[in-house]
Amino acid sequence: MGGGVGMDEAGETLAGFVAARMGEAVLERSVRPIIAGIYTADPSVLATDTVAPGLRAETARHGSLAAAVAVRLAAAGSRRTPEACVQGGMFVLVDALKAAIEEAGGTVLTRTGAFSLRRAASGWTLECGPTKPGPTPGAEPVPAGPGVNVTTERLVLACSASAALRLLTQARIPGLVPDVSVPEGAPIARLTLAVHAPELDDAPVSQGLLVAPAPADERPVAAKALSHLNIKWPWLADQLPPHTHLLRLSYGRLGEAEPAVTIDGALRDIRTLTGVTIAAEAVTDRLLARWNGTLPPLPPEYRARVRALEEQVRPLGGVALTGAWVAGTGIASVVTHARAGAKGLL
């Protein structure tokens, strides 16, 4: 098979690319279940270059999708392990970044949002002010007080699509037309349970598992994924009493109603997926978080509109866009894109 297979229009979607390179069996039995569980979308509507930036080019260079993936895995293997995590939780990373910025002479304003944006004589002026949380973790914060103006020569809009597009529209920049409509993402719910269950000490499903999509009346469970968090993140095990485990169940699929999540239903799903029966009284704590719309399916035409917007913004000077809505989902994609954008402003 030549390196050019899957590089045409059909390969712009992840499903088309995988099917062209490896066939329908690999798509149906491996890629589709994984993508549905992680991205809450079908690979037939996701842009290959957004989900896996650079993979098509690497496939063409190596002449094989398997070879391109192997090269990526080999490169990643030298700097990560299956247990890679931030010991203590992600807030530790945020605190470290804040400390590094302040040590370098910068200022970090927390619980502060950007209300408006306009051009200034020597850069950009943001109206910033206090905010309070929105209705869900993924929603924009809500203004909670008067704003103040902050002027800067260089500005990186590292935020959600809705916030960035709102600010760019308010700026009323001649020739700038933010013609980007973000597709609606699935309603996602994540229920984390702390349970006393010695039967889970042997980690019957290791770090966790994904549930392949199926018609609602054919699904063995309502959950789309289960993560055994104290196995996935070993530092958590040191924080828990003996025989206590943290299990996270994910619910919600694209095109379906907001999932109704209950403790009894979650325990039934756990029994089906792990073979372990956990009584309701063995649940010692719980946390339900909803992330509605935070994982929109990004098709090839969306990627084209975002690239067009970036081309409109670039000549303005002193401003860059980044975030998952521009760079693609995943920390690695966003970090690489954000670094390039910030470097371009120096």
Language-model-detected regions and their locations in the chain:
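A short helix-to-beta-strand connector/capping loop
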Residues: 101-107, 121, 315-318
